[in-house]
Amino acid sequence: MTTAENRARLVLGNWKMHGNLAENAALLAELRAADAAAHCEMGVCVPFPYLAQTAAALQGSAIGWGAQDVSAHAKGAYTGEVAAPMLAEFGCRWVLVGHSERRTLHAESDQLVADKARAALEAGLTPVVCVGESLQEREGGNTLGVIERQLEPVLALGRDALVRMVLAYEPVWAIGTGRTASPEQAQEVHSAIRVALDGLQASQVRVLYGGSVKGANAASLFAMPDIDGGLVGGASLVAEEFLRIAAA
């Protein structure tokens, strides 16, 4: 299935810090058995310890896999960090960078997020660069200003880099809260992101929505012209719900 400008729809699951070997095995088996990727391009971003399990379970399928973070450095004395070339060795295609939980809980700066995106690209991975505003910023009328600020160092990487990325709009106030931006609210921001990319192959860059996407609201969100799929949190941990989103 394709979206506006023939951008292929993409649905990515972000497992966050959930799962165990037994639960993962059951979930991955259900996804593979359903041939979920027939509906659209799909992937799951899993905790680092489960990359080998995920790769083994999905190898040869149409479903990709990836990680939830990456170091800005290729190697070195960076205890606890995981480098992009390491992720590539596990067959990762995707890696999330700049998720709101990383920005908030680990004080990741806009520049660090861009540096991580660059490191991912250099290793042949596709970074999924997350941007979004808090409830306070939205209510203060600062949504677009915040997102433009977050995007600035990413756009500075240039057009050739940008067309190899995916962007994800995740309104912080809608993550894990049960609240969801209306399709019209989400489209407004996605359209503004597309405007910010003007001159940088804006029509080629996929922009996902990532704020409490569920089977019940996926179709209305994905019907918007500038929403190219979803970055799915909790719903990606339930095979039936994740597949419903993919089929929306």
From Swiss-Prot:
Keyword Cell membrane listed: no
Major subcellular location class: cytoplasm
Keywords: Cytoplasm, Gluconeogenesis, Glycolysis, Isomerase
Enzyme Commission identifier(s): 5.3.1.1
Protein location: Cytoplasm
Pfam families linked to this entry: TIM
GO molecular function terms attached to this record: triose-phosphate isomerase activity
Catalytic activity: D-glyceraldehyde 3-phosphate = dihydroxyacetone phosphate
Active site residues per record: H99 (electrophile), E170 (proton acceptor)
GO terms for cellular component: cytosol
Highest taxon listed in the record's lineage: Bacteria
Pathway noted in the entry: Carbohydrate biosynthesis; gluconeogenesis; Carbohydrate degradation; glycolysis; D-glyceraldehyde 3-phosphate from glycerone phosphate: step 1/1
SUPFAM superfamilies: Triosephosphate isomerase (TIM)
GO biological process: gluconeogenesis; glyceraldehyde-3-phosphate biosynthetic process; glycerol catabolic process; glycolytic process
Binding site for substrate: N14, W15, K16, G176, S212, G233, G234
Function statement: Involved in the gluconeogenesis. Catalyzes stereospecifically the conversion of dihydroxyacetone phosphate (DHAP) to D-glyceraldehyde-3-phosphate (G3P).
Subunit structure and binding partners: Homodimer.
Protein family according to the UniProt entry: Belongs to the triosephosphate isomerase family.
Protein name (record): Triosephosphate isomerase
Origin species: Bordetella pertussis (strain Tohama I / ATCC BAA-589 / NCTC 13251)
